[in-house]
Structures are given as structure tokens and as C-alpha cells.
């Protein structure tokens, strides 16, 4: 009797493990499709580019501006790169407020400029400072806030966090380079040459034939 109970427990745990494995597999597969969607992202680089780089940033992250500047410096040498910047709000309400403001300003054609200004701040800005930067750029802040509300951008920003986690990314800044997740190592963020090497690695991996199964 005890042996049967033990075997039943082992079988239950095995089935649970298999179930979790498939759950995470399909969640990751869906996330890699969702990451290409543009409604919750800011489009940078070449809009028609055939090599997609997704950048996850948090506007309260002190390290995100460093990778953002390196990405910007990389673009002149990588004209085929299309960047989708996906803001997350892992560091609190201010992160979400600023992300909603930036995405809400897209229709005014100045969201990229606002993002750049925020990234150039000496420290992560308050929401009041972000609104000041937006106003200085000629952005109608009220209109951007209303647009964020009407378009349901805040839930989409929260979804960006889910996408990142399902892909396997747990920190910012982080990237998806041609379908390859990348989080900078503890020793530091790579420079322009290091980033271009990662681009080449992702291209090579994409061109490599999948191993045949017998």
C-alpha cells in the first residue's frame, strides 16, 4: 500500500513537471511572437529594417541610458536594424507613468525625441521632470496622457514585463537580438563593437540549418 502511494506521488510529480515544461515552452514561444508587435513599443532605427532588435528599458533604471547610447551609436553601421523599444515598469509607478507619456506622444511625432531626452538626464527623472522635458519639445502633455488612457497603453506596458519574463529576461536593460535573448553580464554592458558582434552571432544563428532528427 505504501509503495503504491509512493509510486502515485512520483507519477503525480512527474506529470506536474511535464505540464510545467510545456507551459513554459508555449509561454516562451508566444512571447517571441508578441515581442514583434508594435502597439506597446517605440519604433527606432530603420522602420523597414529586416533585422529586429527589441530593447527592454525602464525609465527609472540607472543603467538603461548606457545601453541606449551604445545602441544609438551602433545604428549608423547597421542600417538594416529595426529597433522596437519596449518600456517596462519594474521599478515602480513613475516608470509606468513616464512610459505611458512617451508612448502616448507617438502620434505627435516626438516620442523618440522625448525618449532620447529622458535617456540623457543625469539621473532617472521624476514624472514632473519628464513632463517638463516633453513640454520643452513642444509635446502637448495633456493630449499624450489622454492618448495613453484612450489607447489602453498602461496594460500594454505591463504586458511588456510579462513578455520579457516569458522570454527569460529578468533585468533591464536587456535585448532580444534577432530572436536571441540577451542580458548584459555582471562585468558590464558591451561597447559598439561588442554589440555588433552579438548582432553577427544572431544573424549566423538564424542562417544555420536546424539539426536533423533521425
Where are these regions (language model features)?
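Membrane-interface motif at the C-terminal end of an N-terminal transmembrane signal
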Residues: 17-31
Amino acid at each position: 500500500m505504501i509503495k503504491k502511494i509512493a509510486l502515485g506521488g512520483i507519477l503525480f510529480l512527474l506529470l506536474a513537471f511535464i505540464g510545467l515544461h510545456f507551459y513554459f515552452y508555449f509561454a516562451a514561444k508566444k512571447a517571441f511572437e508578441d515581442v514583434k508587435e508594435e502597439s506597446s513599443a517605440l519604433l527606432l532605427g530603420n522602420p523597414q529594417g529586416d533585422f529586429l532588435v527589441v530593447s527592454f528599458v525602464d525609465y527609472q533604471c540607472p543603467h538603461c541610458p548606457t545601453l541606449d547610447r551604445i545602441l544609438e551609436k551602433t545604428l549608423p553601421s547597421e542600417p538594416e536594424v529595426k529597433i522596437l523599444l519596449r518600456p517596462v515598469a519594474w521599478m515602480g509607478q513613475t516608470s509606468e507613468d513616464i512610459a505611458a507619456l512617451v508612448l502616448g506622444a507617438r502620434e505627435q511625432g516626438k516620442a523618440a525625441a522625448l525618449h532620447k531626452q529622458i535617456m540623457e538626464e543625469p539621473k532617472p527623472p521624476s514624472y514632473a521632470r519628464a513632463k517638463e522635458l516633453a513640454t520643452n519639445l513642444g509635446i502637448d502633455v495633456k493630449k499624450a496622457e489622454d492618448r495613453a488612457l484612450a489607447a489602453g497603453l498602461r496594460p500594454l506596458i505591463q504586458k511588456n514585463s510579462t513578455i520579457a519574463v516569458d522570454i527569460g529576461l529578468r533585468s533591464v536593460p536587456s535585448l532580444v537580438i534577432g530572436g536571441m535573448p540577451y542580458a548584459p553580464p555582471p562585468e558590464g554592458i558591451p561597447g559598439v563593437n561588442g554589440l555588433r558582434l552579438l548582432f553577427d552571432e544572431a544573424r549566423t544563428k538564424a542562417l544555420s540549418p536546424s539539426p536533423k532528427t533521425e
